[in-house]
Structures are given as C-alpha cells and as structure tokens.
C-alpha cells in the first residue's frame, strides 16, 4: 500500500500536506455551516427571524468557502495531480450532506415563517 504522507510521497509530503489542508478546510467549513444552519432553525422556531437570517448568511458564507476549495481540488483531479484518499471522500460527503441540509432548513424556516404570518392556520 502506498502512503502519500511524509517521505514516502514523491515530493516528500509537501503536496499531500497542501491537499490535506484543503480537505480539512472543506470539512471544517462544512461543519461550521451545519452548526449555523441548525442555529438558524432554532432561532426561527423561537421567532427570532432576523437572527435566523444572519445564521443562514453565515452558513452560506462557510459553504461557499468549502465549495471554492472543493472546486480547486476537482480542477487538480482533472489534471491528474490529486491522489484519492478516504479523507477526501469524507470531506465530499460532509459538504454534500450540509448542502442538502441547507435546502431542507431553508424550506423549514419558510414554513415556520408562513405559519407565523397566518397565525398557525
């Protein structure tokens, strides 16, 4: 089994370190976005719609950051210079899941807003 970390990699680990940093940026940003999304939902349920919107904006900012890094990695992959790793698969999964949750939470907050405006009818 080939290890791409440390001295086993062709470049002494420099490329993998850069890739790992990018992967952890995706994971961290997706995690921060997920936390902001659920905070937005909690705020909406409490009737704090302005605060909820701020949390949604923060989540969107974090997801854009993760997506931008993902796009850079995909470009490297198309050029054939990105080694596959389980950590990368995990990062992709975290980002995709959070993006799906964003869509669902946006709809849930919309329903909360609608119910609030209609007095629960």
Q: Predicted segment positions?
A:
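Terminal alpha-helical segments
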Residues: 2-121
